[in-house]
Design a protein with these regions (language model features):
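Positively charged, low-complexity terminal tracts
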Residues: 21-153
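Bacterial Sec-dependent N-terminal signal peptides
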Residues: 1-26
């Protein structure tokens, strides 16, 4: 009788183990590239989760030794507002000025500059080194705002 109970208990444990091992992954969201700007050096990304959509920009890094810079923008309404603020700031910014931008608990550093006569921000992600930045041009910002307003993305 004892042997029967042990066999029954082992078979019960073995029948439950496969269920437990397959229950470890749960889809929590998806990320898609919505559109590329500035010949692909800036990508508008959309992350879809249970809490809603979050937009971000992927900026090509100045240094080939570092990963791209990911700039979070927030949900659609917040993203458009932030982009409009960036555009207005670039109109009035002066050489050498820098700004802190905080979104979703992360603080980015924006440094105003000009590259080949084009106004731009050099953007450092949190905890990055001095050569680890991406560029975001005013023209690109305005194109992204137009895209949001025209396509209702």
């Amino acid at each position: 009788m004892f042997r029967f109970k042990v066999i029954l208990l082992l078979s019960l444990i073995l029948s439950v183990c496969p269920i437990m091992s397959h229950a470890q992954l749960k889809k929590s969201g998806s990320i898609e590239r919505v559109k590329g700007f500035t010949n692909g050096s800036v990508s508008l990304m959309k992350s879809t989760t249970e809490r809603g959509d979050v937009y971000s920009l992927t900026l090509r890094n100045n240094s080939k030794f570092h990963d791209d810079v990911n700039l979070l923008l927030g949900d659609k309404k917040t993203a458009v507002k932030n982009l409009k603020d960036f555009s207005e700031t670039l109109k009035t910014a002066k050489s050498g000025e820098h700004f802190d931008f905080e979104v979703m608990g992360l603080t980015y550093t924006f440094f105003y500059g000009s590259t080949l006569g084009q106004k731009c921000f050099k953007i450092w992600a949190p905890n990055s080194v001095s050569s680890d930045y991406g560029r975001l041009f005013k023209v690109t910002i305005d194109d992204i705002i137009k895209y949001f307003l025209n396509n209702g993305e």
